[in-house]
Structures are given as C-alpha cells and as structure tokens.
Amino acid sequence: MKASIYLVTVFILLLLLLPTAIPHDYSDALRKSILFFEGQRSGRLPKQQRMAWRRNSALNDGKNLKTDLVGGYYDAGDNVKFHFPMAFTATMLAWSSVDFGRYMSQHDFRHNLVAVKWATDYLLKTVSQLPNRIFVHVGEVQPDHDCWERPEDMDTPRTAFALDAPYPASDLAGEIAAALAAASIAFKQANPKYSAILLNKAVQTFQYADSHRGSYTDNPGIKQAVCPFYCSVNGYKDELLWGAAWLRRATGEDSYLRYLVDNGQAFGESSNYFEFGWDNKVGGVNVLVAKEVLQNNVTAIAAYKDTAEKMMCSFLPETNGPHMSYTPGGLIYKPGSTQLQNTAALSFLLLTYADYLSTSSQQLNCGNLKFQPDSLRRIVKRQVDYVLGDNPMKLSYMIGYGERYPGLIHHRGSSIPSVTVHPAAFGCIAGWNIFSSPNPNPNILIGAVIGGPDVDDRFIGGRTNASETEPTTYINAPFVGVFAYFKSNPNFS
C-alpha cells in the first residue's frame, strides 16, 4: 500500500515538473491590437484618447494645397501619412468587423469601429475633390527620415501631394473605394447615415479609378515622392477587382458582379495568387469573392473560388505543390519583406476562408484530398501563438503583451520622452541621440506587432533594425479579426 502511494506521489510530482504550454490571453491580445492604433493617430486627438503619451500633431496638413488633410494614421515608426497603405489598413479593420465582429465583445467591437472611422474620416478627405483631384500622401519622406522627432515636435515639411485628372490613380483610388465600401458594411447598423455617406463616396471613387486606369506611381513626381516605400509594384488591376468585389458585397448590385466576370482573367485573378498585402490584393480578392460561390452558388465567378482554393491548399504540406514556406519554428515565410506583415495578412485569409467553408458546410478540395476547415484554423493558431511568444526566441512580438517583448523598437513617438513629461521640443539632431540610446523606449506602444524574425527564427532587435522592430498599421489590422476568433475559441487545437 505504501509503495503504491509512493509511486502515485512520484508520478504526480513528475507531471508537475513537465513543461506545459501557458495558454494565451487572446482577449488581451485583441484589446491591445486595437489600442495600438491610438498610438498612430495624426491630428487633433479626442478627450477619449487612451494612449495618453500621445498629443496633437500635424494640425496644418494640407495647407499647401489649401485643403484640410488633418487626421488619419502615421503608417509606421515615422511621421509620414501614405494613403495607399492607410486605405488597406482601413479595409482590413473593416473586414475584421464585418466577418469577425460577432466574436468581439461590445467594448472591443466599438473600439474597432472607432479605429476604422479614424481612417475613413480621413480617407473621405482624400477623395473630397473627385472627380478632379485625389490626394496621395502628406509629408516629405527624405527630410522626415533624416530626423528622429516625435510627431508633436516635427518641423520637417508637411507637403501634401495630389494627382489631378486625367492622371491615373487606379490602385490608390481602387483601394480607397474598397476601404469605404467595406466600412459602409461595418457601420450599417451602428451608424446608417455614415454608412450611406461611405458607400456613396466608394461608388464615386471606384468610378474614378476605373475611368483613369493606371498606377499612381506612374506619375514621375509622385514616384519620386513615394518610392521606394510604397511604389505600386504590382500595378493597378488587382485594386480594381478589389474595389469591385467590396462594392458587390456592399450593394449586391449585378453591375459589380459583371465587372468581376468580365475582368477577372484579364486583370490577373488567377496569377500571383499566393500574395496578399498593401500592394497585392489578388489573394484577398479571390477569398472575398469565393464567399458568394460557396454560400450562394454564384457559378459565374467560380474561377475566383477555384483560385482561392489553390492558395489554401498551398499551406498544407500533404498536398501536391506549390507550397508556402515555413521557418523551422513554424512561421509562414515569404522573402522580401517584414515577416509578420505576411503572417498577419495570410492568416486572416486562411481563417476567413475556413469560416466561409464552415458556414456553407463544405470542405477544402485539394486534388484527391479533402480537408476540414479546422485544418486551416490550426495553421493560423500556430501563427498567432508564435507571434505571442511560442517561438524559438521565447519572445512576444506584440509590444506590451506577455512578460518578454522587445524594448527598443523603431518608432519615433515611442522612443522619445512624451510631451507630458518633457514639454520642451526635441530637435531633429537631438532625437538621434535618443535613437542611439541603449535604454528601452519610454512610451510603450501597447499592442504594436513589429516586423518580427528572419527565415531562421532569429531576432536581433534594436532600433537600427527597422525590418525587425518597426510596427506598421497594416501588420496590426489583419490580426484584429484573427485575435477576435481565438478570443471566442481559446481552447481550439
């Protein structure tokens, strides 16, 4: 008897000594991923501002063109406002509300709509002079990057750039149309009047995009101002499909369905379909359009669903190639950009397609193999947990989440003492002394998901390593919907 008790005791002690995975708090991650956007705000901040170390900035934007371009978001760790990636950010935040809002608490859903509206209020300004003019971005990149200044102090030129008709801007206008259309769905119940304004302007903006075909960076002046940061490398045709797809979903009108049918092949819905991000919308177009095929059997656009299926199958190693690549630690890997930018956008598509399969009671068909929607969700779960700390570096790549996350991130406002504790301005050159400091950023940019590790799961860090430590709005935005799903399904495995 004593021997049996002894063995049981030893067994229990051994179990206690075994390493156990600490479950992640997806609710906390969701809340913080939305809060991050308050740290990126430009313009006059509201009384409800929760990221308290930020203050008003860039209150004269647009003045050189005699227009109001105050507001919007800084795209990353600098103080420039690029409208192309900002519009993509708005689209993804709105899509998170539309398809994953049911997984959010009322509190989180409301704050996500606030984040969407901060972007769309500004985007409405960028297309306020259509069909004659569209505003492209605000701030001169080189002078801005030559200085290390918090937004509240910046004294670099705030030149606003615009394109006048007939110069083309199909990619920029197409993405803005998509953002406004997606947001119109998100606000349909909460604010019907605002929803109608967004949809009306989305229709007008898409008409402009389709009437003046070409990329916004085809213009030499804009190319010099924007490139190499946000050049439209992939061209404009994917944004036309993207805008049409969102307008089809927002309106249900057959004219947008015909547009997708007539232009899908010519505009490349079946090419380069492994990509999705601020520049290339092909993967997103196919998944978004596939919803109607899966749920309503709209066979006229079945080609989009077939291409979306090819993309989904590429994530599963059991299928015939081609395949997506993964790091040794399990992170989705694509060469040529910050890794978590790809992880965020592709994870969102995987989870969204899984949702469309589930609601239509269908499986993923990969040749002779069939997969349940949960096969895709497991891939996403691995990505999310990796980002939150289950990775070879044992490091959370979300700032302010968990016990261990990078302290020196490439972000001007976060790295320089706040005006609340140091009212005197930091000049252009003085800021570089702070940039070189080994001390952690004094202002925690809560919820920011940074660039992340390399192909071998290594992370060096430091403010000088912008590809690893700089956050962007378009990394965070897709993660909002992803975190919302796992908040409501925390025990999924």
From Swiss-Prot:
Membrane-spanning ranges: none
Domain of life: Eukaryota
Keywords: Carbohydrate metabolism, Cell wall biogenesis/degradation, Cellulose degradation, Glycoprotein, Glycosidase, Hydrolase, Polysaccharide degradation, Secreted, Signal
InterPro entries associated with the record: 6-hairpin_glycosidase_sf, 6hp_glycosidase-like_sf, Glyco_hydro_9, Glyco_hydro_9_His_AS
Recorded GO MF terms: cellulase activity
PANTHER family listed in its UniProt record: ENDO-1,4-BETA-GLUCANASE
Reactions it catalyzes: Endohydrolysis of (1->4)-beta-D-glucosidic linkages in cellulose, lichenin and cereal beta-D-glucans
Entry annotated with the keyword Cell wall biogenesis/degradation: yes
GO cellular component, one term: extracellular region
Segment forming the signal sequence: 1-23
Listed EC numbers: 3.2.1.4
Protein's recorded name: Endoglucanase 23
Active-site residues, as the UniProt record annotates them: D78, H410, E470
Positions annotated as glycosylated: N297, N465
The keyword 4Fe-4S belongs to this UniProt entry's keyword annotation: no
Family recorded in the similarity comment: Belongs to the glycosyl hydrolase 9 (cellulase E) family.
Principal localisation: secreted
